[in-house]
């Protein structure tokens, strides 16, 4: 990210394929000024797919030392688990629905990570895919600074972004 000059406030990760990103952001890169305020969210679509390999294999491609392969970090049942790492280190965790967020805290659906999901339940939220176009219509939405439509969104939508950045204390 520093190479391309892009410094997001939040990095949104999806599933085991991106599980190492929260690990790097929260721990490995945290001391660096560029990454120090960056947050991460990991979304779980299907807990069955966790990205599990033996520890040595993950160490080879990740560069992570033994420290990270403990039961409270990436280790799960003597293997390395990339999704578990993402869940442990992410600032927030989302799933595809409120129901799924509750289900994965139970042994039957938890795929061996139900205890971790219960431990992180304060950071876990279900978000249903899709949108309610009646309620979230930028032409009529009373909660945004500037209404817009398909004809003027390039000019008007940016005003909402600037207002939100200002409200959140971010650089405008």
Where are these regions (language model features)?
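Catalytic cores of nucleotide-sugar-dependent glycosyltransferases that transfer UDP/GDP/TDP-activated
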Residues: 1-172
């Amino acid at each position: 990210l520093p190479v391309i000059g892009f410094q997001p406030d939040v990095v949104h990760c999806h599933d085991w394929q991106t599980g190492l990103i929260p690990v790097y952001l929260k721990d490995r890169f945290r001391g660096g000024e560029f990454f120090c305020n960056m947050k991460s969210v990991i979304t779980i679509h299907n807990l069955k797919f966790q990205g599990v390999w033996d520890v040595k294999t993950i160490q080879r491609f990740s560069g992570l030392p033994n420290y990270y392969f403990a039961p409270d970090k990436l280790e799960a049942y003597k293997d390395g688990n990339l999704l578990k790492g993402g869940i442990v280190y992410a600032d927030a965790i989302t799933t595809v629905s409120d129901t799924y967020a509750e289900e994965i805290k139970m042994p039957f659906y938890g795929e061996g990570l139900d205890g971790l999901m219960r431990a992180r339940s304060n950071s876990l939220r279900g978000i249903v895919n899709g949108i309610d176009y009646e309620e979230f219509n930028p032409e009529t939405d009373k909660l945004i600074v500037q209404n817009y439509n398909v004809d003027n969104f390039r000019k008007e939508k940016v005003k909402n972004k600037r207002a939100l950045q200002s409200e959140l204390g971010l650089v405008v």
